[in-house]
Amino acid sequence: MAALLLRHVGRHCLRAHLSPQLCIRNAVPLGTTAKEEMERFWNKNLGSNRPLSPHITIYRWSLPMAMSICHRGTGIALSAGVSLFGLSALLLPGNFESHLELVKSLCLGPTLIYTAKFGIVFPLMYHTWNGIRHLIWDLGKGLTIPQLTQSGVVVLILTVLSSVGLAAM
């Protein structure tokens, strides 16, 4: 069997060496090479002054898109905040009461305290309500574009109302 295969390959190589045109059965000339295609592509795009890839400026921002980005951002910020709070409680001298007394001794006005509490509670409430919205999506509900926008508005209203209420406590 090996001898037959060797004989066939040997004949093929001999034919290719003596007369290469007989060994190529369906010789089709290439239209263009990859290099020519690439040069034509770059010449066309550079001449038209368009960006290399879809750029952020061509997208129309929608409420669900912005809320998705904000949900990720609040998740990162809340994780970092909890981690920093835990590390500061572990490493700073004193206890909670001494830190609370320090804040009270600063004599900050009620407006500044309310604003600080609102700033702390707003990302938490947004992430919570938007997380509930994502859980509803996991059930397969509210996935049409109008429902996405409506649920986004509801999340924003609930976020503001609950943040105002919690900051007032």
Swiss-Prot record:
Record carries keyword Transmembrane helix: yes
| Chain ranges passing through the membrane | 63-92, 113-137, 145-166
Task: Cite the residue span of the transit peptide.
Answer: 1-29
Keywords on record: Electron transport, Heme, Iron, Membrane, Metal-binding, Mitochondrion, Mitochondrion inner membrane, Transit peptide, Transmembrane, Transmembrane helix, Transport, Tricarboxylic acid cycle
Indicate which residues the UniProt annotation says bind heme b.
Answer: H127
Where in the body, by tissue, does this protein show up? Detected in heart muscle (at protein level).
Bound cofactor: record note: The heme b is bound between the two transmembrane subunits SDHC and SDHD.
Names of required cofactors: heme b
Identify the residue ranges that face the Mitochondrial intermembrane compartment according to the record.
Answer: 93-112, 167-169
Query: What's a GO biological-process term for it?
Result: tricarboxylic acid cycle
How is this protein situated with respect to the membrane?
Multi-pass membrane protein
What are its GO cellular component terms?
mitochondrial inner membrane; respiratory chain complex II (succinate dehydrogenase)
As for what it does, the entry says: Membrane-anchoring subunit of succinate dehydrogenase (SDH) that is involved in complex II of the mitochondrial electron transport chain and is responsible for transferring electrons from succinate to ubiquinone (coenzyme Q). SDH also oxidizes malate to the non-canonical enol form of oxaloacetate, enol-oxaloacetate. Enol-oxaloacetate, which is a potent inhibitor of the succinate dehydrogenase activity, is further isomerized into keto-oxaloacetate.
- UniProt-recorded name of the protein: Succinate dehydrogenase cytochrome b560 subunit, mitochondrial
What is the scientific name of the source organism? Answer: Sus scrofa
